[in-house]
From Swiss-Prot:
The lineage of its organism: Archaea, Methanobacteriati, Methanobacteriota, Stenosarchaea group, Halobacteria. This is FAD synthase. Its cofactor is a divalent metal cation. It comes from Halobacterium salinarum (strain ATCC 700922 / JCM 11081 / NRC-1) (Halobacterium halobium). Its EC number is 2.7.7.2. GO terms for biological process: FAD biosynthetic process; FMN metabolic process. One of its GO terms (molecular function) is FMN adenylyltransferase activity. Keywords: ATP-binding, FAD, Flavoprotein, FMN, Nucleotide-binding, Nucleotidyltransferase, Transferase. Disulfide bonds: none annotated.
Length: 146
């Protein structure tokens, strides 16, 4: 059985997320998804939704076999526990595949690192970014406190 790991923030799920997970699932037989903890998201605004809610939504998606929240300190700890054959990176994720491969080798994990294919918008106003969804909500409904 080929185990695949996909990872990300998965805040405000959109068609790009679904495409990434479908692509990742096609790389093997079993898809494990690791969701970044809110406190570990430093490369962009933190997620709007809580960790458990994001995990539960991702777990409910058809391509996903297992979903878990990432480790609070060591992003590779869940990868070691899963021992995947493939890590599927999103086509636009900021991760350096070579650095990931080096860390996997240092930890004794024999695992390929692949990039998922991009998902192009299928119509003019389709939104494929959680940040863009949040911006659109603020623009249409106002920037007021709930």
């Amino acid at each position: 059985m080929t185990r695949v790991v996909a990872q990300g923030t998965f805040d405000l799920i959109h068609p790009g997320h679904v495409h990434y997970l479908e692509d990742a699932a096609a790389m093997g037989d079993e898809l494990h998804v690791i969701l970044a903890r809110r406190e570990n998201v430093t490369h962009k605004d933190p997620p709007v939704l809580p960790n458990r809610q994001r995990r539960d939504v991702v777990a409910a998606l058809d391509p996903v076999d297992h979903a878990r929240i990432g480790h609070p300190e060591d992003i590779f700890a869940p990868i070691e526990a899963i021992d995947p054959d493939v890590i599927a990176l999103g086509f636009d994720q900021h991760h350096d595949a070579a650095a990931i491969e080096a860390e996997l080798a240092d930890r004794g994990l024999d695992c390929a690192v692949e990039r998922a294919s991009p998902r192009e918008a299928r119509y003019d106003d389709e939104v494929l970014s959680s940040g863009d969804i949040a911006d659109r909500v603020l623009a249409q409904r106002g920037d007021s406190d709930p």
